[in-house]
Amino acid sequence: MMIKVLLLLSSALVLFTPEAEGGCGCHTECSLQCSFSGCGYVCGLRCRCSWGK
């Protein structure tokens, strides 16, 4: 079970790569909950991801 979680986490981090490339960034702690819509990620109810700084 733990291995599956780690695999999901690592693939999510790859998908939501860095703001340095000019894309949308996502906080690590909510990247698994992000759904992509245009350039706004909505992460669960508490986190919101936006353009990288």
UniProtKB/Swiss-Prot annotation:
Residues where Tryptophan amide is found: 51
Molecular-function GO terms, alphabetical: toxin activity
Main location: secreted
Record keywords: Amidation, Disulfide bond, Nematocyst, Neurotoxin, Secreted, Signal, Toxin
Changes after translation: Contains 4 disulfide bonds.
Signal peptide residue numbers: 1-22
Compartments, as annotated in UniProt: Secreted; Nematocyst
Cellular component terms per the entry's GO annotation: extracellular region; nematocyst
Function description: In vivo, only causes a weak change in behavior in shrimps (C.multidentata) (slight twitching of the walking legs), but no lethal effect is observed. No activity is observed when injected into fly larvae (M.domestica).
Name assigned to this protein: Toxin CjTL7
